[in-house]
Swiss-Prot record:
This is Methyl-accepting chemotaxis protein PctA. Belongs to the methyl-accepting chemotaxis (MCP) protein family. The ligand binding region binds directly to 17 L-amino acids. L-tryptophan binds at residues 121, 126-128, 144-147, 173. Residues 410-424 have a biased composition (Basic and acidic residues).
Length: 629
């Protein structure tokens, strides 16, 4: 918002802020001085009023205390009943005290004006009597409300002494009505009031009777003021009050203070009026200064306004660069006007040069456009022919790639056949080796079977021996049995053994016969196996011969396939070289075509730039023509 203000308005705003700040500081400083002055005057006034009122209270109480002392001194000299009655009835005492009385050491009580006392009343037990005797001199009681008159009273008492002995205590009841009137007469021009307070904070006399006998902490619960010299502040019913305490000196047995309470708002009311007056005066002064300053700024800014109108005429009017400002002073505005004239003169020369350059630029742009159009046509023709060559080379490359692909397929199939022939040859060779090994193993088996047949013959011979031994054993066992039978009972055990031996021999003979039968069968099988092995060996040799002939044929086929594969690889290699050459030509043609396209695009960009240049040249010519040079 400040940026949109005029320069004169900014100056006026800044000046108003300075003036306002100056008046504000002056008002605050004056307010500070006035506050201090009012506070000092108020403190001096309260101190003086407190001292005067305290002195008046002291004098008022002192005169009455003096009457009590004089009465005690008179009674000390003569305390006969007649003297006591006459003395207590003196007008000076009856007009001053509500009651004057004497309590004697023997319990006799005399009071004037006379008033009936309760039965058994003993003055020696009363506080005023005890306090006076204990103090040994003049005493004052705390204020209390009289039961008969409902007035606030105090008692002044002093002992009656003769020859160092206490004869009794004389006292007088004082109404505080006069003292209340003295204190209540202080209204401080309606700003406050005074009240009497004891040293322990109990209020003794107060304009508001409801506050009497209350403590300061009860009246001011939030921030209770301390009873001391000086000034303090406290809140009462939502208002701040200034409190000052002045001690009442010369009072026996009691400590009393005169408290002065002032409403702070009323005490500083003059300061509030001064603030209002100062603010009003400051506002009036500021308005007057701003009006005068506005007129002065308007007068001083006149040359600047003329310069602004001239610049607006150049910027928004006919653009007359032949106009100059009239410089009539050598101040800042004169220097600014002279600089403006120099600037316009320089712009004038520059615009004339720009006008000539704009015409030349238009002609040059026309020549560039014509040349670019011609180059564009040639580039189109070159692009068409390049595309034709590229298409032919692409067809040649496709044919070469087809030949190379077919040659590669043939070479691949020949390689597969060669590999398969090699595999077959290896299989045949493995078969020949296996059949040779089989023939050798058959021959070995025939030899083993022949050896086995020979050993079975040997086993038959051994079995014949075993059979002979079994027969002999059987005969021996039979003979042994016969001999045992002859021996009778003595040969029974031997007969059993012989019989068992004969059984074993018989069983051995049967087993030998079975083995003989099995060996004969084994010999028959061995002879048949030898015949079969011999026939298998003959067939195996024939198979080996046939496999050798098949291996030789496969070797011949493998050599022929290898030759065909070599030819196919040569054709594929030549075709791949031809394809690489075709691809290289194709890439070159493509690069040429790309470069040609880029050239066409550059020519088109040049044409667009030339068109834009021609447009800008026309615009520049229009702008130059808008100035009057």
């Amino acid at each position: 918002m400040i940026k949109s203000l005029k320069f004169s308005h900014k100056i006026l705003l800044a000046a108003s802020l300075v003036v306002f700040a100056a008046f504000a500081l002056f008002t605050l400083y004056n307010d500070y001085l006035q506050r201090n002055a009012i506070r000092e005057d108020l403190e001096s006034y309260l101190r003086e009023m407190g001292d005067v009122t305290s002195s008046n209270i002291q004098n008022w109480l002192g005169g009455r205390l003096l009457l009590v002392e004089q009465t005690a001194q008179t009674l000390a000299r003569d305390h006969s009943p007649e003297t006591v009655s006459a003395l207590l009835e003196q007008p000076a005492l009856t007009s001053t005290f509500s009651f004057t009385y004497l309590g004697q050491q023997d319990g006799v009580f005399t009071m004037r004006p006379d008033s009936p006392m309760p039965a058994g009343y003993d003055p020696r037990s009363r506080p005023w009597y005890k306090d006076a005797v204990a103090a040994g001199g003049l005493t004052l009681t705390e204020p209390y409300v009289d039961a008969a008159t409902q007035e606030l009273i105090i008692t002044a008492a002093t002992p009656v002494k003769a020859a160092g002995n206490t004869l009794g205590v004389v006292g007088g009841d004082l109404s505080l009505k006069t003292l209340v009137q003295i204190i209540n007469s202080l209204d401080f021009s309606g700003m406050g009031y005074a009240f009497l307070v004891s040293g322990d904070g109990k209020i003794l006399v107060h304009p508001d009777k409801e506050q009497v006998m209350k403590t300061l902490s009860e009246v001011y619960p939030q921030n209770t003021p301390k009873i001391a010299t000086g000034f303090s502040e406290a809140e009462l019913h939502g208002h701040t009050r200034i409190l000052a305490f002045t001690p009442i000196k010369g009072l026996p047995s009691v400590t009393w203070y005169l408290a002065l309470s002032i409403d702070k708002d009323k005490a500083y009311a003059m300061l509030s009026k001064f603030r209002v007056s100062a603010i009003a005066a400051a506002l009036i002064s500021i308005v007057a200064i701003l009006v005068l300053l506005g007129l002065l700024i308007r007068l001083l800014m006149q040359p600047l306004h003329l310069m602004g109108r001239a610049m607006q005429d150049i910027a928004q009017g006919e653009g007359d660069l032949t106009k100059r400002l009239a410089v009539t002073s050598r101040d800042e505005f004169g220097v600014l006007g002279d600089a403006f004239n120099q600037f316009v003169e320089r712009i004038h020369r520059s615009i004339r040069e720009v006008a000539g350059t704009a015409h030349k630029l238009h002609d040059v742009s026309q020549l560039v456009v014509n040349a670019s159009n011609s180059s564009m046509a040639n580039s189109d023709e070159q692009s068409n022919r390049t595309n034709s060559v590229a298409a032919a080379i692409n067809e040649l490359g496709a044919a070469a790639q087809e030949i190379a692909r077919n040659a590669a397929d043939a070479s691949h199939h020949a390689s597969d056949a060669n590999h398969q022939a090699e595999d077959g040859k290896q299989v045949v060779e493995q078969t020949i080796r296996a059949m040779n090994e089989l023939s050798e193993k058959i021959s070995a088996s025939c030899a083993n079977i022949e050896a086995l047949n020979s050993r079975t013959v040997n086993i038959g011979q051994i079995l014949e021996v075993i059979k002979g031994i079994s027969e002999q054993t059987n005969l021996l066992a039979l003979n042994a049995a016969i001999e045992a039978a002859r021996a009778g009972e003595a040969g029974r055990g031997f007969a059993v053994v012989a019989d068992e031996v004969r059984n074993l021999a018989h069983r051995a003979q049967e087993s030998a016969q079975q083995i003989q039968k099995m060996i004969e069968e084994l010999q028959v099988g061995a002879r048949e196996a030898v015949a079969t092995m011999t026939e298998s060996q003959r067939y195996s040799l024939e198979s080996v011969e046939i496999a050798n002939r098949a291996g030789e044929s496969l070797s011949s086929v493998t050599r022929r396939i290898g030759e065909i594969d070599g030819m196919n690889q040569s054709v594929a290699t030549a075709t791949e070289e031809q394809t690489a050459v075709v691809d290289s030509l194709n890439m070159d043609i493509t690069e040429i075509n790309t470069l040609n396209q880029e050239g066409v695009e550059n020519l088109q960009a040049t044409l667009r730039a030339c068109g834009e240049l021609e447009t800008q040249a026309g615009r520049l010519r229009q702008l130059v023509d808008s100035f009057k040079i």
